[in-house]
Each structure stands twice: as C-alpha cells, then as structure tokens.
Design a protein with these regions (language model features):
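Short aromatic/hydrophobic "clamp" motif used to bind/position activated sugar donors
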Residues: 86
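Glycine-rich, basic loop-to-helix element that forms the pyrophosphate-binding segment
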Residues: 65-81, 91, 102, 153
Length: 313
C-alpha cells in the first residue's frame, strides 16, 4: 500500500435519502482524523440524493448502480476501496467527530484485531418527527476505554445477539480477503452473518464510548413482520458449522443457546401475530416451546392467538 492511498475508506450505500444524507456526509467530513476517502454508492435513487452527493465535489467519490439492494451496494464500495481500514456507514446515521481517530488508534495498537466497534446511541424523533441535534447528546458520551466483556474472541457472544452496529465498526481491509464480503443472497441479518464469519478468524475490540448515532424511523425494516425468521436460520447454521465455542475456548452453554433461540422464535411469532399472520405465528410459538420446553408459557400464545388476542405494541 503506497503513501498516496488513504488510511480509511468510508463506504455509504444510499437509496432515496435526500432528507438525511447531507448530515451523514458532514459527520464524516468533520472527523478529526482526516486521512479518509469517502465513497457513496447510490443504489438507483429516484429522489435528489445523487444531486446532493454530487454537490460535495472532490470531497466525495460517487458510484452509481441500478437498484440492487444494500448488500450489493456495500460490496461494490468494498471492491473500490483503497484504504487500510474500511467503515460501512448507513446513509442516515451520524458519527461523533472523534470516531475514526479513536478506532484507528486502537487498530494500530492491536495489529491482531480484525474489527473495532463502539457503543452507539439510539436516535429517535420527537412527537413532531424532528430528530434532536447531535450536539444534544454530548452529555451522554461516557468514558474512553475498552469494554473487556465484549472484546477479544466474541464468536460465542455473537450467537446471542448482533452486538455490532454496522455504522459503528472499523474493519481491517484484509479481513474481507480472508472472510469474504456481505452475502448478497440474504435480505436481512447480512451484517450479523459477516460478523460471525469474522469472529472465527479475528478478535474484536469494543470501545465503551458511544461514537455513533443510530437513527430510528417508525416503519424501520427491522421492526416489521417477515415470512422467514432469518435470525434463527442464521444462528442454527452458525452453531452447526462452528459449534458454540470461540477460538480461545470460551463457550456458550447449549442450554443458554436454546433459551435464546426460543426467545427469538417467540419474538418472531409475536411480530407475525400483530401483522395478522396467525398460522405462522403459532408455528413459531410451537418452535419456541420445542426448543426450550421450560418456556411452557409460550404454548399459551397459540390458543390466545386463535381466540383473537393480539399484543399491544
């Protein structure tokens, strides 16, 4: 890698995000760490997103493609990236100014690390749909330091939940050569799938300080009912392939894994029950009980659903 190449490549896939894309771009350009290339991959936007990005001129490299989905757009950016480290940022999130500086410093101090991530803050709109300014969160920044519990070899912990927010991560570029990129066949949980693969080959570091704002919308996709439970499919596949232990020997007990899977089956069932998919919901409630028979209460949802009960969310 020559000196002319950037230290960090920031890749932002975007689609119809004219309302928020400028704030996201500005948060990257305002980083205290300046050795950065910013790549925006426009995934066939039909609003003014592309024009807004183009207005930044040489500060941003704009790539365009026909609408293909976020995984394809991210992988497009990864192929074009020249940096030693790569960040993948969602088009409506926000970085605090020291995000890259703190993460790059940690990467340099720990060359064996494949991924550095941080805590993040949920960013909700008020009752009028207005998001509070990022400056209003400065009182919630907390201490600088490493969260040891969620650092190191964390594969076994990733079998419980997707602890890594995509926008909050910094990844060593060589990781993609060894572990692959985003699985374009997955419509959901594609980030979790990648983190699981990386966690088999590299230790992670988690910084305690929140460095990213994660913007939330009322109809956000991760809250909607789906026909397939991608979470349980992903975790079942991972456990079957790699077991329940991290490379350093730390393990998740089978009982805890099953209890967690039962919880996911139940959550999937409740989402589908709210959406009116009673048959699918009841199958999920039954799977939850079969996975963890101690959760007898999950069986009670089946007759309740048939009698017309719905959770009030």
């Amino acid at each position: 890698m020559t000196d002319s190449k950037p230290s960090v490549s920031v890749i932002i896939p975007t689609y119809n995000c004219e309302t928020y894309i400028a704030e996201t771009i500005n948060s990257v350009l305002n980083q205290t760490f300046k050795d950065v290339e910013l790549i925006i991959v426009d995934d066939g936007s039909t609003d003014r997103t592309r024009q807004i990005v183009a207005s930044y001129g040489g500060d941003v490299r704009l790539l365009t493609q026909l609408y293909s989905g976020v995984c394809v757009a991210r992988n497009h950016g990864i192929r074009e990236a020249a940096g030693q480290y790569i960040c993948l940022m969602d088009h409506d999130d926000y970085w605090f100014p020291d995000k890259l500086a703190l993460q790059v410093d940690e990467m340099k101090r720990r060359p064996e690390t494949g991924l550095v991530y941080s805590t993040f803050l949920w960013w909700f709109p008020d009752t009028h749909g207005v998001f509070p300014p990022p400056e209003s969160f400065t009182g919630h920044m907390g201490e600088i330091g490493i969260d040891e519990e969620f650092s190191g070899w964390i594969y076994h912990l990733l079998l419980l939940d997707c602890w890594v927010l995509t926008s909050a991560a910094l990844i060593r570029a060589e990781v993609f050569d060894k572990c692959g990129v985003f699985d374009e066949s997955l419509p959901y949980s594609e980030d979790w799938d990648l983190w699981l693969r990386i966690s088999r080959e590299y230790p992670f570091i988690k910084l305690k300080r929140p460095l990213t704002l994660y913007r939330q919308h009322p109809n956000q996709g991760n809250r909607l009912a789906r026909a397939i439970d991608y979470r349980t499919e992903l975790l079942t596949k991972a456990a079957s392939k790699w077991g329940l232990c991290s490379p350093d020997g730390r393990c998740l007990t089978r009982a805890r894994f099953k209890k967690n899977m039962a919880r996911y089956h139940m959550e999937f069932g409740l989402k589908n029950l709210v959406a009116g998919n009673v048959e699918l919901a009841n199958r999920s409630f039954l799977k939850s009980w079969i996975t963890s028979p101690a959760r007898v209460k999950n069986l009670a949802y089946i007759p309740a659903a048939l009698l017309g009960w719905r959770p009030k969310w």
